Design a protein with these regions (language model features):
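Glycine-rich flexible loops
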Residues: 1-198
Length: 198
């Protein structure tokens, strides 16, 4: 959990989230439970003991601990993705400035990066979702659909998806892998927006 906390603090230092924004979840290989950041806790002050354990089944999810806290309001998003995979897996939802600016300018993120093949070597960018409400089941389902789960490989075809006027969801087999997808896409978004070609 220390690495997850470090990522949240780094995101806050980059102004990618305000104190109570952003959420991260993860599950261990073969587990029927996952852990998620709580709602309303300042991310720069979060501790290991604040994480909430969630059980999963095909009918939904159930909170198992820390009943004085609520799981992130985006729990449906995390449940939809983590309930699909059996491997160790991480889901990161943040609000990076330049990526959101690019989408607000009308760009579909895969179009933004197609002139930058170095990014595509490591990060596969899905089509943006529609303009969907935060915390909604619709947001959760669109993110999972656009990330494109592949049954045979039991993995997703894409690594990151943008939510217009909101943020991104990035996934990976480690917290660093998921976070690096955001770092790469944010870097390219900054380059494109700085070029004044939009």
């Amino acid at each position: 959990m220390k690495n997850v906390i470090d990522i949240l603090k780094d995101s806050y230092s980059r102004n990618w989230i305000t104190p109570r924004d952003g959420n991260i979840s993860y599950k261990l290989e073969g587990a029927k439970e996952f852990y998620i950041t709580p709602s309303g806790v300042r991310k720069q002050e979060i501790n290991n003991s604040d994480f909430i354990q969630i059980s999963m089944n095909n009918d939904g999810w159930e909170q198992l601990n820390n009943f004085n806290l609520k799981p992130s309001g985006e729990i449906e998003l995390h449940y939809e993705i983590l309930n699909s995979v059996t491997m160790e897996f991480f889901v990161v939802h943040l609000h990076p400035t330049y990526i959101i600016s690019a989408m607000y300018s009308g760009l579909n993120l895969p179009d933004l990066v197609k002139d930058f093949p170095e990014l595509s070597r490591y990060t596969k960018v899905a089509n943006n979702t529609d303009l969907v409400l935060p915390l909604s089941k619709d947001l959760a389902e669109q993110c999972k659909t656009n990330l494109s789960y592949h049954n045979e490989s039991q993995n997703f075809n894409f690594d990151i998806v943008g939510i217009p006027n909101h943020g991104v969801v990035s996934i990976g087999k480690s917290i660093f892998e998921a976070y690096e997808h955001i770092e790469r896409l944010e870097h390219i978004s900054k380059i494109v927006l700085s070029s004044n070609k939009i």
